[in-house]
Amino acid sequence: MLEERDADELYRLVERNRAYLARWMPWAADQTLEGTTAFLRMTERRRAENNGFEAALVCEGRIVGAAGFPGVDWVARATSIGYWLDEEHQGRGLMTQAVRALVDHAFDEWDLHRVEIQAAVDNQRSRAIPERLGFVEEGIRREAERVGERYLDLVLYGLLAPT
């Protein structure tokens, strides 16, 4: 789990990947150490309230990315998964493995019914993860996210709990 004490390392990772992440993530272009610390405090609160969590992806003792649940709708028994990975560590299956573990947690530990993932239409690497894991493409949310001065269309993927 990511915790406030990870702020420096996580921020340095964002700094190294800022140009890459800023193409897809609305927060990346101007993320600060203070903003990273505030995000980690928020995710600790969510975890304490049983309303999601953020996990670190660690490779060779270093944080190389993050993946987690930004919240849980306990009435609908649904959640979404968000993720990002250091550009140098892509293409190794790390994020697919992490997202698979999160999906298993959502269905097996939380007994949820539905998991969603959204990815920018043009972000093929991000889209490949839900596609590999059997998520169903459910539609396009046109100009659904503003990143810098442009709007991105997002593909919505959904996966239902096995029956």
Spans of features found by a protein language model:
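Amphipathic alpha-helical segments that line or abut small-molecule/effector binding pockets
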Residues: 8-11, 37, 96-108
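Conserved G/P- and acidic residue-centered "switch" motifs that form tight phosphate/ATP-binding loops
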Residues: 61, 93, 123, 149
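GNAT-family acyltransferases
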Residues: 1-88, 151-163
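Positions that flank functional sites
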Residues: 29, 121-122, 145
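Conserved GNAT acetyl-CoA-binding A-motif
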Residues: 108-118
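Conserved acetyl-CoA-binding loop-helix of GNAT-fold acetyltransferases
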Residues: 84-85, 91-105, 124-132
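Conserved catalytic-core motifs of GNAT/GCN5-like acyltransferases
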Residues: 116-118, 136-153
